[in-house]
UniProtKB/Swiss-Prot annotation:
The lineage of its organism: Bacteria, Bacillati, Cyanobacteriota, Cyanophyceae, Nostocales. One of its GO terms (molecular function) is NADH dehydrogenase (ubiquinone) activity. NCBIfam families: nuoB_fam, PRK06411.1. It is a peripheral membrane protein. The gene is ndhK. It catalyses: a plastoquinone + NADH + (n+1) H(+)(in) = a plastoquinol + NAD(+) + n H(+)(out); a plastoquinone + NADPH + (n+1) H(+)(in) = a plastoquinol + NADP(+) + n H(+)(out). It is an enzyme of class 7 (translocase). NDH-1 can be composed of about 15 different subunits; different subcomplexes with different compositions have been identified which probably have different functions. Transmembrane segments: none annotated. This is NAD(P)H-quinone oxidoreductase subunit K.
Length: 245
């Protein structure tokens, strides 16, 4: 074995595969990121929330202020979507009525998993000022769909909406892919049966062909002052005789 005496110290430092363990320098630690699949997946989701805006009352006016340059909710990665199939967050802002409840549930079911809900305002959470006397207001949207973050207020300020989004981002950061397959939607909220009365469709597209348009009721024609057709008088007389029986 012949040693090369001309080998300098600089050439020794160029050894590609040294035997000893290399020391981790400060420059190397700043360029290496250690993470898990859950953390990477959650980070990508919380950084690009696409909300579906479901505004039915005055709370939506406060949420509209976030779109402006003063609050600028785009810095959180929020992009408003008009289609539920492209959204992963729905924000219910305003009173939910019995007639609007089936449409809200349908929009929620069309959203892909995982999906989240923010209940914004007192009317959405408990019914608000309509919870006592109104026969059509739903006393809490959590009776229809699961809610992740409750945002009280009448209406909440835009700063409160930002705080709710930050809390939702923290919740998304702690999600686990293994636990997500075991947790069902019914485990996330308290559900009670809501008696919804089925109502016939009003807008059928056949208004011009309706019977009442060609044969208006007798009371209506008398109130307007139109002459009552003989056929209408005969039909009204027959109906009265049938009722008397």
């Amino acid at each position: 074995m012949v040693l090369n005496s001309d080998l300098t110290t600089q050439d020794k430092e160029r050894i590609i595969n040294p035997i000893e363990r290399p020391t981790v320098t400060q420059d190397l630690s700043e360029n290496v990121i250690l993470t898990t699949v859950d953390d990477l997946y959650n980070w990508a989701r919380l950084s690009s929330l696409w909300p579906l805006l479901f505004g039915t009352a005055c709370c939506f006016i406060e949420f509209a202020a976030l779109i402006g340059s003063r609050f600028d909710f785009d810095r959180f990665g929020l992009i408003p979507r008009s289609s539920p199939r492209q959204a992963d967050l729905i924000i219910t802002a305003g009173t939910i009525t019995m007639k609007m409840a089936p449409q809200l549930v349908r929009l929620y079911e069309q959203m892909p998993e995982p999906k989240y809900v923010i209940a914004m305002g007192a009317c959405t959470i408990t019914g608000g000022m309509f919870s006592v006397d109104s026969p059509t207001a739903v006393r809490g949207v959590d009776k229809l769909i699961p809610v992740d973050v409750y945002l009280p207020g009448c209406p909440p300020r835009p700063e409160a909406i930002i705080d709710a989004i930050i809390k939702l981002r923290k919740k998304i950061a702690n999600d686990s892919m293994q636990e997500r397959s075991l947790i069902r939607q019914t485990h996330r909220f308290y559900s009670t049966t809501h008696n919804l009365k089925p109502v016939a469709e009003i807008l059928t597209g056949k208004y011009m062909q309706s019977e009442t348009r060609f044969n208006p009721p007798k009371e209506l024609t008398e109130a307007i002052g139109l002459p009552v057709p003989p056929a209408l008088l005969t039909s009204q007389t027959q109906k009265e005789e049938q009722k008397r029986g």
